[in-house]
Amino acid sequence: MDQKEYLLNDQQMKKFIRDGYVTVQTDLPVEFHAAVFQQTENVFEMEGNPGNNLLPRIPMIQEVFDDRWVNGALTSVLGKDYYLQPHRHCHYNPPNSNGQNLHQDGGKRWSHYTRWLLALYYPQETPEELGPTGIIPKSHYYGNRDSINDENEIPLCGKAGTVTITNYDLWHRAMPNSSSKKRYMMKFLFARMSEPEVPSWNNQDTEWASADISQSDTENDVKMFHQVWEWHCGQTNGNGHYPSSVTMPDSTKIRELVEVLGQDSEPKCIDIAYAISEFGANAVPALVKQLESESEDIRRYAFCALSAIGKPAVSALITATQHPDWWVRASAAETLGNIGNSAQAAVPSLIQALQDESEQVRQLAVEALGTIGQHDSTAVPNLALSLQDENERVRRNSVLALARLGRYAHQAVNDLQMVLSDDNRYVRGDAVHALRRIDTPEAREVLIQFLLKSRWCPLTSKESGY
């Protein structure tokens, strides 16, 4: 997007990193949103919830995501080649409902980097009594329900046409609808395709100033936010890019901090993890050792620290991909994928991991190849073979990895054509996007033929069949 005025500014981007959400208002007229609302009413009454077919069933909703403010916010957070994924859902909150419990849509994932987000659109004015989505700011950094304070809940109220961009891991719920009216919220899932190399928002200053952040944040909160900010700026981790209070290696201090990982609350342990990361390469051996723990929480804390350390951790993580225990191999693969571009030396080891006996290792290895190997075709033949894996999560991650490689994946067009009939709907959907990004004449022909035969007619219904 060329017009910088529609991109987020530095303060909005910092708020997104800290709180996990940002809200924008479309330029579309009130009449447009009223028409979306009425079409939604008609579809729900006559056919029920269209689920993933929401967009082809009500195609005018695409205008919301073509809006310059919405496009600008999505570009700012995910980069200009962001991807509207096949999963979307219209959430209906009926009159006099009790609402939902707080939850995360994405499950308990490890990474703090923004590779996935949700866009929430209201086609009607949504005051608090109508049961808006409630969110817990800053909760996307935590995977345990006990870490979340319900008293911090904020209702996402707004006029018709309000769109809130949230981190996929943000804890949220439908709040009680105490009114006599219906509330609809259209939820769409988006993914980052390219690892950040430069800021994609209207960036004026690449420095992170703690004075811009809430006084309630701890020193280690700021370290965490700063790390994510630097990642979004495309500054390679592992090069001492943020100030450190550590003046010299201290093996005793490192050992003391590592030993208490997992012995306190999740927020405190994540604070400790980012504090350990400031020791850089000196902390790597002790942190990699923690990947051997049978506690998923401890492995995640080590993952956070190793991801922040970056390139100096790559060699030890490559070695860990050969560990006898599957969870160590899986954790190493996931950490390498999260480090991203700086972990390119791991590509051969991750290709080897595609033959691992553990489904979890294969899932994470193919995903990692999509974030690490984005600038060459080395992994493409092996990723194409993984499209035939018996595990559907491996196939899903493989096809998305090929989509991320884009034109470098041109050798996989025939393999992608085969999975357009996969049993998993998301493998099919992501294969369409992979072909679009490959964009060779062969890929375009395969794509056009598939879309012609799978065309959806939004005017056809049981009342009007032809």
Question: Which positions does each model-derived feature cover?
Answer:
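Non-heme Fe(II)/2-oxoglutarate
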Residues: 175-259, 269-270, 280
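Conserved metal-binding segment of the jelly-roll/cupin
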Residues: 157-171
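Structural detector for internal amphipathic alpha-helices that build alpha-solenoid repeat scaffolds
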Residues: 226-249, 267-282, 289, 297-312, ...
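Hydrophobic beta-strand signal
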Residues: 23, 164-165, 187
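Non-heme Fe(II)-dependent double-stranded beta-helix
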Residues: 1-109
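Short inter-helical turns and helix N-cap capping residues of alpha-solenoid HEAT/ARM repeat scaffolds
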Residues: 264-265, 294-295, 324-325, 357-358, ...
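Catalytic core of non-heme Fe(II) oxygenases with the double-stranded beta-helix
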Residues: 98-157
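Buried hydrophobic core positions in alpha-solenoid tandem helical repeats
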Residues: 256-258, 286-288, 316-318, 349-351, ...
